[in-house]
């Protein structure tokens, strides 16, 4: 096979290794015969076939291999057992090492590092000061940049973007048009996809799923088997966990907690220090806030408001424009509806129905 380049006498020392500048022996691609390239340790580093090339001050050494039409340029370094192939490009001050692979049309540039057994392929881009390591995979048209870290067995693909100081690790998957940014962390077996966003100091972990156009930010945490979707907003220091579901246009914020098998949906607002758990549902345009607790199989819906230190439990229902607040308790199979109001230390229980414009207090 006719060689396309030779090693020259011009050398540099990198990490105790002697590297040789290469010179083209024939025309190929945009390389002309006589063009000087970058540096390699030996001819095993750069294939003598295909259009692959090492440009300028880039260096390839160790047992690293570059072949196909791959390009290594600027001050990029590829070493150890790394493999760069197809039409991949490594540029800027990027480093690819360990047993990492970059192939197809992927690009690694800036000060990014890809190492371990990580793979970057498809049309994916890794840039800035991002680090991709472990067995992580970045592919599709995904972008990982800024100071992001993707590691473990994490997978980022589709058109997903990971940036800021965000971290994606464990067996987490981020895909679709999802965005993870700020100091957010997505890990364990969590999945974030579609157009969902996780940012700020938020954490999504366990087997939690965030999808559609849902947003999780602030110091919020979503974990366990919780599912958040639709146009939902979860923020502040809110926590969603267990098998809880929050969806549609619902909002959960402040220090609110939703867990167990609870569901919050519609245009419901849940905030303050309240807690919803068990099989309770809050939906419609209902609001639950302050230190209220809703549990059991209770349902709050319509335009109802529950706040203060109220307890709503068992099979109780609050709906219409009803308001229950202060230290009131609504339990058993009781119903509070229409424009009724229950407050102070009132207890509504059994099969009681408080409706119309009734007012109950103690």
Residue spans of the language-model regions?
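Terminal amphipathic alpha-helical/low-complexity segments used for targeting or macromolecular assembly
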Residues: 1-51, 111, 146, 248, ...
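Extracellular repeat-rich scaffold modules on cell surfaces
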Residues: 49, 60-61
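Fold-core signature of tandem repeat domains
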Residues: 54, 60, 66, 70-72, ...
């Amino acid at each position: 096979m006719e060689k396309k380049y030779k090693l020259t006498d011009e050398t540099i020392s990198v990490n105790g290794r002697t590297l040789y500048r290469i010179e083209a022996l024939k025309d190929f691609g945009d390389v002309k015969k006589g063009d000087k390239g970058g540096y390699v340790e030996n001819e095993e580093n750069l294939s003598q076939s295909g259009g692959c090339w090492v440009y300028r001050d880039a260096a390839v050494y160790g047992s690293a291999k570059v072949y196909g039409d791959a390009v290594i340029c600027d001050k990029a370094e590829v070493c150890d057992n790394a493999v760069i192939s197809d039409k991949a490009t490594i540029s800027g001050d990027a480093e690819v090492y360990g047993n990492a692979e970059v192939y197809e049309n992927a690009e690694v540039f800036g000060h990014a590092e890809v190492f371990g057994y990580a793979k970057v392929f498809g049309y994916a881009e890794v840039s800035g000061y991002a680090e991709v390591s472990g067995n992580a995979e970045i592919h599709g048209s995904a972008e990982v940049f800024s100071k992001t870290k993707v590691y473990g067995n994490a997978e980022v693909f589709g058109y997903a973007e990971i940036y800021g100081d965000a971290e994606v690790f464990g067996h987490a998957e981020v895909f679709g048009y999802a965005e993870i940014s700020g100091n957010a962390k997505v890990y364990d077996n969590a999945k974030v996809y579609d157009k969902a966003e996780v940012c700020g100091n938020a954490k999504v972990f366990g087997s939690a799923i965030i999808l559609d156009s849902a947003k999780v930010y602030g110091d919020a945490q979503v974990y366990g088997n919780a599912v958040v979707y639709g146009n939902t907003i979860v923020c502040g220091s809110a926590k969603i966990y267990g098998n809880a579901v929050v969806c549609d246009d619902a909002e959960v914020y402040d220090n609110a907690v939703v867990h167990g098998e609870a569901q919050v949906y519609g245009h419901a607002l849940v905030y303050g220090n309240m807690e919803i758990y068990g099989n309770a549902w809050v939906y419609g345009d209902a609001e639950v806030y302050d230190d209220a607790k809703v549990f059991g199989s209770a349902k709050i819906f319509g335009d109802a408001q529950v706040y203060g230190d109220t307890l709503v439990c068992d099979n109780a229902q609050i709906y219409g424009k009803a308001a229950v607040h202060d230290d009131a308790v609504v339990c058993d199979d009781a119903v509070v509806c229409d424009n009724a109001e229950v407050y102070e230390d009132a207890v509504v229980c059994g099969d009681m129905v408080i409706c119309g414009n009734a007012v109950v207090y103690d």
